[in-house]
Amino acid sequence: MNKMKIDWATMSWNPVTGCRHGCPYCYARRTATRFNAGLEDPAPLAGGLHVLPEKIKATPYPYGFEPALHRYRLGQPQNTKEPQTVFVCSMADLFGRWVPTSWIVEVLDACRKAPQHRYLFLTKNPARYLELDHLALLPHESNFWYGSTVANMDAVGMYVMQGVNINSFWSMEPLLGPVDMAAAEGLPEWVILGAETGNRPDKVTPAREWVDNIVAFCEENEIPVFFKDNLRKYFPDLPASAFPWEV
C-alpha cells in the first residue's frame, strides 16, 4: 500500500489496476500509460484480462491500463498494522462490468482479513454493488464505504442504492455539470466535491452555482461535504471540509 497525496484517505491500495470506461480526464490512465512496460502476457484471460501471481520487477503496470489482478498485493492490508483509511483501487474501477466477480471477492476477502482499516471504494457502475449485495457478497461492516462517481445528472440516474444498508458516498470529482441530488434514488452519507484537473482542451470549470446548490442541499439534509483543493482554487471561500467519521 502507498501513502496518498489526497486528504480524504491516508493510503491507496491497488490489487486490481486498469479500466475501460475511457474517461477523457482520467489521471489513472495517464499514469499507467506513462509507466506502461509494454510487456506481452504469455497467458492472458479471455477478454484481455491479466492475472499477476507475482510482481514483475521494476514495473507496476506491465500491461499498461488493461485490467489486471495483482494477486501478490492481496496481503498488503494485513501487513499494515496501523489503522488507515484506504482508497481501494485508485488505479481501476473494481466494480466495472469487465471485472470478474471472483476478483472482487478476492479483494473484499482481503479487506475483511484486515479489519483495522477503513476501506473506501469508488465506481462509475454502482449497479454492481446491488448485484453483489443480492448475491450476499457485499460486506456490510461499518469500515466499508461504497462510493459512486457522480459528475453530472446522467450519473445521478445510475445511482440506485435506496434500501441498501451500507455506508455510501458520492465523489463529484470532476464536477462536470449541475446535479440535482433530490432526484436520486437514495442519498449518500458523504459527498466529495472537486474540479477537473489536467490541461485537456475541453476541460470543464465548475460553476459556482453548481457548487452552491449541492452544498445547500447537503446542509439541509445533514450530509457532510469534503472540498478538494482543486475546487478551492476556484472558490477559496468554501467552508471547512467534513468527514462522516471522527478525525
Describe the predicted segments one by one.
Residues 110-117, 163-167, 213-224:
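A structural motif corresponding to the C-terminal end of an alpha-helix
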Residues 134, 138, 143-147, 237-247:
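Short, electropositive alpha-helical surface patch
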Residues 85-87, 118-120, 143-147, 167-171, ...:
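Structural preference for beta-strand elements that scaffold enzyme active sites
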Residues 1-12, 34-38, 176, 181-247:
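Auxiliary Fe-S-binding modules of radical SAM enzymes
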Residues 1-144, 153-161, 179-183, 204:
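Conserved Radical SAM active-site core
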Residues 45, 105-109, 139-141, 163-166, ...:
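Short, low-complexity, polar/charged sequence segments that are solvent-exposed and flexible
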Residues 91-93, 124-126, 149-153, 173-175, ...:
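Active-site beta-loop-alpha junctions enriched in small/polar residues
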